[in-house]
Amino acid sequence: MYIIRKAVEYFKPKINRAYMNEALKKLTEKEKKIFLEMSDYDKFHSLEVYKKIKKTELKNNEKYSKLALLHDCGKENVSIITRVLHKLGFKTQLRNHAQRSFEKLEKVDEEVAILAKNHHNRDYSQEMDAFQECDDES
């Protein structure tokens, strides 16, 4: 069921424009540009993570709100086939997306860039554990 849901979200992401505009108010102009360059699926996913963050102890943490929106900016526009292969454990270009996210963000907000680089690292911090739970559920 998970794979079917993800496929539907990939091909037909239902982005709530009003909610997206609300979330974008958290970002600087440079951060907005990075967010808006993401694929529709990654924007949808990031907004879902952002929505979940707002229901946790991270809800007032500006850096983690930004991380929710920008953590996957390094994925760029990869195909669904690459995404499925990655989920199945094959080495794909997605394995380096956290580093590419860091590189895109480091001159914009170094702290968010460092968080993006580490958003898959377990035991990084309690805050990151809470973030990862939201990311994994989205």
Model-derived features: positions:
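Divalent metal-dependent catalytic cores for phosphoryl transfer on phosphate-bearing substrates
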Residues: 32-45, 51-138
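Non-catalytic interface/linker regions that flank or bridge core catalytic/transmembrane domains
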Residues: 1-33
